[in-house]
Structures are given as C-alpha cells and as structure tokens.
Amino acid sequence: MKQGKLVRTRNVVEADEAINLLVTRPKEEMVGLGLLYGKPGLGKTTYATRIALQRNYVYLRLEATSTPKSFTLQLITGIYNYLNLEYPPLYGTTNAIFRRCMDEIERHEDIVIIVDEIDYAFKQPQLLGTIRDIVDNTAAIVILVGMQNARDRLAQINEYYFDRCNSFYEFESASLKDITAIAREVLEVDTSPEQINSIHFNSGGNLRKAMKMLHLLETSIKAEQGHSETAEQRKTLCLTPKLSPI
C-alpha cells in the first residue's frame, strides 16, 4: 500500500474549498477562522496533516493535557519550522512567548495554522481566547478541526466566537466512489468491483475501517499471488529437462 497519499475524495475537495474561501476572503472585512468537523474515522486528521505538509501550513494538535503555555510553545515551534528557522525561543512567560508568535504572524500574513482536536479547548476559555486573538489581530488563517458536535459546542460556549467562523465543512461518510478512488491510487494490486463494493458496505463509509479492509485485501491478494508464483516456479523446475554431464 502506498503511503502518504491524499486522494481527491469528496471530503478532500470540499475541505479544500472551505480553506480556499478563507484564503480569498476580503481580509479587512472577515477574520480567517474556519472549522472542519465530523464523526470519528472520516479522515479529518489525515487530511489536516497531509494538506499541512503539502502546502506548508503550521499543524498543531491539542491534547487532553494542553494548556495555554503548552499551546504557545507548540505554536512558536510550528512557526519557526514554517519559516525554516532554528532554535525557537522557548523561554519566558506565556504572554511573552505568545507575543513573539504574534510578531512573526504579523510579518507573514499568508500563514495558515491548523489546530486539530480543538474539542480539548472547549473547557479552557483562555486557550480558546488565545486562538481567537490570532485571527482578531492578524490576517492569518486558523482552521479548527473537531468532532461531529464541535460546531454546536462552539456556538453554545461562545456565541461571539462562533460568529467569527467564516467557513465550515462537515466531513461525510466515504462513498463507494471515494473508496474506489482510494483503492485505485494506494493499492499495489488489482481489485474487482465486487471486492470494493463489499468493503464499502462493511465499513459503513467509515474511512478508517475501509483502509484496514483494503490493507487486508491487498495482503491477501499478494499472498495468493506469491503462492501461485511459487507453485508455478516449482512446476517449471520439474518440467525442465535435466542435461547429462558432458
């Protein structure tokens, strides 16, 4: 199975459009805040990490233990990597480090920052406020990535924060067409329409499950091909006439 590919499924196309809407927005009229959300297993994190790598975006991932300080440290490290600079200044107060981040962001208005697992910030008003300050005070784009209820949670927690989001996309279950395209681009073996239909049905459109099934299918096909080739080689050896020594 080929690794690291970002296949142009429906979700990828729509998520790209959601980001491009912010890239082309009137910057003085709209802040660059967007939200990608959806059920588990639909490829949100895969999309976020791979599009960040392809387009040189800053990718940050929150954790259950994330704090405003750990976020600012992660942010300044990501910004320095984006600028190809070494040794980010990791000393000072949270506010001092964040101020350095803002200085660099203000100097590079085209920067795009993806914050994955935003759900972990919903119980931390200060952390949410830190992210809001980025889009309120700079022309940078910040894409939040969260679970299926992230949009509703954000609206409940802070109506004014929610109003700042100018682009949304909810990831949907993978279609048969999506899984067919993925199989065609990432598998190193040929498959039948019946096999792909079966994977789509049994995965229920969950991309994570579908990828596991595709991997198992590829492994099985390769094993069968290897067994067949070995048997054919043995048959060929048996049929090859032995030459008498001169």
Predicted regions: what they are:
Residues 73, 84-141, 174-182, 194-212, ...:
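Mid-core helix/loop region of P-loop NTP-binding domains shared across ATPases and GTPases
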Residues 57, 156-173:
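A short helix-turn-beta junction within AAA+ P-loop NTPase domains corresponding to the substrate/partner-engaging
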Residues 52-65:
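Conserved catalytic segments around the Walker B and adjacent sensor/switch elements
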Residues 34-40, 120, 134-158:
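Sensor-1/coupling segment of RecA-like P-loop NTPase cores
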Residues 1-17, 31-32, 41, 45-49, ...:
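C-terminal alpha-helical "lid" subdomain
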Residues 56, 69-88:
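Conserved NTP-binding/hydrolysis module of P-loop NTPases
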Residues 27-34, 56:
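Pre-Walker A (Motif I) flank of P-loop NTPase domains
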Residues 16-17, 21-26:
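A structured, charge-rich N-terminal accessory region that forms the first stable segment of a protein
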